[in-house]
């Protein structure tokens, strides 16, 4: 008998029991590869699937050399969980892919004056798709499961797989999953989607998992790996001094790299001024950080490109919805309108774009971050915020 069986003599919590019932009645084959990072969320995901009677194998992606959740430390903890649960553990070396698709693109983005969102790109190009391919081709497993706090509803509009927020609003990760294509969403299981973090800790303790009290990572994995985001950027981008200026060109300070600033930032500017200033633009061509008082920093619209439509078909006419423009930001009301394709757009095969029109001024509309569209708890789609010279701001 595996330790997973012997460690579950205690009855599950109400939330844990509901999760087990959902897994036991899940349609289709109950055979799955679990993406294991070595943290408590993925550990409990594997434990619940084992307890629910699924055929489970652990799969860990080796993303980086060194220490941290995506490095050797995570591999050791993931292997220990698989041993405890009595399931096979596989490690796939994806360091080259991660360096090329995530690290280099992240560095390039910061160099160009945008603030990239590597987690969503990593989910699409490094994690979910490759994990599904590996599980099917190498182990004959039709599904993967992860410890994300999100939900999937099958059979939505036009038979689409719909992505929903996790029930724990403080841990909901749907914002980072908006870019997953339909063929991937149809083969994913999120056992923790209706649990809170407290539920997860409690269930992990019930199973006696070694990761039950493991602290959460508090930052981007690359920042954890290097000690801080600044240290990561300094390792790839040499200091390049430039000016901090007002929107009229008045020089108010100096900086050592635009990559260390983001739109909406107020603290840490190193500028003494008669009123608080906010970053409103990063200009890589001039190597300038442009700042302004809050009264001049509001923005009413932005352009969104590289859109992935999740729960609805591609938009053909304006739509009222809610949009979230940063992971920790609150959703706000907006209208989304398709931008007509020009002959030049067609000739260059540019992807379709949409314009977001906000009802109220927004102060952290950041090129490179995702704008994720919601209707209630359902993710309609999302895309990347682009630079937009036509954005309507209070400065005009």
From Swiss-Prot:
Active-site residues per Swiss-Prot or TrEMBL entry: 122 (nucleophile), 221 (cysteine persulfide intermediate)
InterPro entries: MnmA-like, MnmA-like_C, MnmA-like_central, MnmA-like_central_sf, Rossmann-like_a/b/a_fold
Subcellular location: Cytoplasm
Recorded GO MF terms: ATP binding; tRNA binding; tRNA-uridine 2-sulfurtransferase activity
Enzyme Commission number(s) of this protein: 2.8.1.13
SS bond list: 122-221
Domain of life of the organism encoding this protein: Bacteria
CDD domains: MnmA_TRMU-like (cd01998)
Function: Catalyzes the 2-thiolation of uridine at the wobble position (U34) of tRNA, leading to the formation of s(2)U34.
Name of protein: tRNA-specific 2-thiouridylase MnmA
UniProt organism field: Parasynechococcus marenigrum (strain WH8102)
Gene: mnmA
């Amino acid at each position: 008998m595996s330790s997973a069986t012997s460690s579950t003599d205690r009855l599950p919590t109400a939330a844990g029991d509901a999760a087990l019932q959902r897994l036991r009645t899940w349609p289709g084959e109950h055979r799955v590869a679990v993406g294991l990072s070595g943290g408590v969320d993925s550990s409990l995901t594997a434990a619940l699937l084992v307890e629910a009677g699924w055929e489970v194998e652990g799969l860990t992606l080796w993303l980086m050399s060194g220490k941290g959740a995506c490095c050797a430390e995570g591999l050791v903890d993931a292997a220990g969980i698989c041993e405890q649960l009595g399931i096979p553990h596989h490690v796939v070396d994806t360091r080259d892919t991660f360096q090329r698709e995530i690290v280099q693109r992240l560095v390039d983005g910061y160099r160009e004056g945008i603030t990239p969102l590597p987690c969503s790109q990593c989910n699409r190009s490094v994690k979910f798709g490759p994990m599904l391919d590996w599980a099917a081709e190498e182990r004959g497993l039709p599904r993967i499961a992860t410890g994300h706090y999100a939900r999937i509803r099958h059979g939505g509009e036009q038979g689409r797989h719909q992505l929903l927020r996790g029930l724990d609003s403080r841990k909901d990760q749907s914002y980072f999953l908006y870019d997953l294509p339909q063929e991937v969403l149809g083969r994913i299981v999120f056992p923790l989607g209706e649990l809170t973090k407290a539920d997860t800790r409690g269930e992990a303790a019930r199973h006696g998992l070694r990761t039950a009290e493991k602290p959460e990572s508090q930052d981007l994995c690359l920042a954890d790996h290097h000690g801080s985001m600044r240290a990561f950027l300094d390792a790839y981008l040499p200091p390049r001094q430039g000016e901090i200026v007002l929107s009229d060109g008045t020089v108010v300070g100096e900086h050592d790299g635009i990559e260390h600033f983001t739109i909406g930032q107020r603290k840490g500017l190193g500028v003494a001024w008669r009123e608080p200033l906010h970053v409103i633009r990063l200009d890589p061509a001039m190597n300038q950080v442009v700042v302004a008082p809050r009264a001049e920093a509001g923005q009413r619209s932005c352009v969104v490109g590289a859109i992935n439509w999740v729960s609805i078909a591609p938009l053909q006419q304006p739509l009222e919805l809610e949009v979230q423009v940063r992971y920790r930001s609150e959703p706000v009301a907006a209208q989304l309108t398709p931008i007509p394709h020009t002959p030049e757009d067609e000739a260059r095969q540019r992807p379709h774009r949409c314009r977001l029109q906000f009802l109220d001024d927004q102060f952290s509309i950041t090129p490179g971050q995702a704008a994720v569209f919601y209707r209630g708890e359902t993710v309609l789609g999302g895309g990347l915020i682009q630079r937009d010279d036509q954005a309507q701001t209070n400065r005009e």
